[in-house]
C-alpha cells in the first residue's frame, strides 16, 4: 500500500484480533524466555510473499514465538484437531491459523486429502499475493535432536505460489528457513 501524499509504502493495519493475540503471545514468550536473539533479520525479504519453515521442538510455544517476532501478519498451519479444543480453537482462529488434516487423524482419507489440497492451494495463493505463511514441515512437534522426515506440503505450497506469481507478474515468493534452539 502506498501513501498518496508521500509515495511511501505503508503496511496495512493488522486485524484487531491478530494484534491482541500477538500482544498476548509476546507477553507469554517474555515470561517463558529469558532472552530471544534474532540473527540476520535484516535479510528478511521486503517484497513478495514469504514461506517460513522451521522445525517444531516445543509444541505451542513455537508458533507463539514466531508470531511474536516475525514482522507483519503471519498465517500459520496447524493440525486440525487443535481447533476442537474450545478456548484454543478460538485463539487459533483469531491468530490466523489454518487447520490441516493429518492422515492419521482422519476417518475419510479421500475427503481429507481434498480439503488439504484446497487449503494448500489457498495458502499458495496467499503467498503469491504477498502474505507470509509459517509451516512446520515435519508435521509434528518433537524433542528429538535432529530433524524428522519432512513432508511435501511446504514444497508444494511454495512451488504453486511461485508459479502463480510468475503467471500474474507479481514479485516471486521467498523461502525463509528458521532455526529454533
Segments (PLM) and residue ranges:
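Short, compositionally biased low-complexity segments
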Residues: 1-3, 93-94
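Short, Lys/Arg-rich, polar N-terminal cytosolic tail immediately upstream
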Residues: 2-12
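Soluble catalytic domains of membrane acyltransferases
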Residues: 11-181
